[in-house]
């Protein structure tokens, strides 16, 4: 599958093969990661990577775009059908690029953004001070209650006080559903636009397994990987023609040059996969598997942020533990379970250490694992955390789990 690469750069070839083996042998439980469809990877590795196509279908600055025009148009139409909206821009290189383009389109420098606090589950692009959005705009944040749920009353009070031009509802580490209707009511109360960032839950949204951002949000952004299982990239959606025109200009020429046509083709392929009936069954499995995992951990007396989960991820709370999120990340990694350390509400440790870990079910569900496997995984996670310094136990668990994961290959033939 990679004949030329093996011949011309054996060093990179071997490293890619090493990563292929790692993905096969480890339990991938980082909530933002997934195994993309094999068809998506084939589209990404096509001759489309050779083509520049600045502009939009039938409005290009380069010649020779008659084929890629058809490809991008197909991606747009499939995105509109998938998300049940009237306008879609499929050129954003990433979710962060998509969010920055929305701000560029709809805000002026130093306008006000209200988004979820980073330690409560928000994303860097929702106004974090260290990000571009926190530097180019005035950013404010809302958070969660003591029970770990979004505090909508607090969000309203903050919005009334600061009068933001745009409110962002979305997250990178929040285990519950977003109430888009409530956020729209808050936005209308203060005359703000509402951006729904569904990067994490898009695969659940399009299958009816999570509340839909439309008709409540003025504009919606998402990545195309994560729970959608498409290529790494971003999309922007709206039902407002005026906003759509501004978004297009904000992407090109506002924040990007040439679109990545091989990625746009892969997005189109991914959207077609998402429209199939079996994708709904996958989304249901993602949610049910996470419920099994949460139950197993709670039965072992482990504390979860918000007490559980309503989507594809959960957050473990170590605020009252002698070990940190970083410690847990390393210990579980030694056992072949890949998670990520994560800040949590009430955080007392550094963002590089943290008091929690984030765990997702999307990738292992894509491999076909079900309730039986997730119960086993929950028990093994508990065993590791309850004896966190026992390296021999970690290595023993790794071998046990390797025997299990070998029954669920990532791909049925080498693709790398």
UniProtKB/Swiss-Prot annotation:
SUPFAM superfamilies: PLP-dependent transferases. The modification N6-(pyridoxal phosphate)lysine is found at residue 226. One of its GO terms (biological process) is tetrahydrofolate metabolic process. One of its GO terms (cellular component) is cytoplasm. It catalyses: (6R)-5,10-methylene-5,6,7,8-tetrahydrofolate + glycine + H2O = (6S)-5,6,7,8-tetrahydrofolate + L-serine. It is an enzyme of class 2 (transferase). The record marks 225 as: Plays an important role in substrate specificity. One of its GO terms (molecular function) is pyridoxal phosphate binding. Its main location: cytoplasm. Catalyzes the reversible interconversion of serine and glycine with tetrahydrofolate (THF) serving as the one-carbon carrier. This reaction serves as the major source of one-carbon groups required for the biosynthesis of purines, thymidylate, methionine, and other important biomolecules. Also exhibits THF-independent aldolase activity toward beta-hydroxyamino acids, producing glycine and aldehydes, via a retro-aldol mechanism. PANTHER family: SERINE HYDROXYMETHYLTRANSFERASE. Belongs to the SHMT family. NCBIfam families: PRK00011.1. This is Serine hydroxymethyltransferase. It comes from Helicobacter pylori (strain ATCC 700392 / 26695) (Campylobacter pylori). The lineage of its organism: Bacteria, Pseudomonadati, Campylobacterota, Epsilonproteobacteria, Campylobacterales. The gene is glyA.
